[in-house]
Amino acid sequence: PIATTSAFTIAEGSLKATQSANHGIIKSTISQSTGKWYCEIGIISGSSRMVGVALDTSLVTQNYIGHAADGYGYYSSGQKYSNNSASSYGASYANGDVIGIALDMDAGTVTFYKNNSSQGAAFSSLSGSFVFAVGDDGGSVYVANFGQDSSFAGNETAQGNADGNGI
């Protein structure tokens, strides 16, 4: 299950999101307040994309992740966003790239990966219950991998990230 606006069309077991021409955010529905969590987002098509995490109470009608203080996003230009403020962060990304999101609620940090290359810790001092999220200006397609599909629904995954048990 997911939380979104009508700007998105959902398919493939709620793992593929196609966004229309409207602003909006789509969020996973299982929030995390402790532990270490990881997902990958395949960037299939579009422009002006953003991936990240948001408090489970954040509004899906916001223009983008990080528009308010309850979200933390990594924009396709390489900037990071929170509280409606942008700053330099990592490499830009484009169609065909896979963006990993490592949410460490024990340390209160979120780190982003581009094609399995860490961009460094983007944000710290996170507290509360967070969900994974994507969104943009419209017209983009995303595929999410929460570990269910090592082939990434036919798209190549960055893989290589494992927990302490090697999984």
Question: Over which residues does each language-model region extend?
Answer:
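PRY/SPRY (B30.2) beta-sandwich protein-interaction domains
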Residues: P1-I167
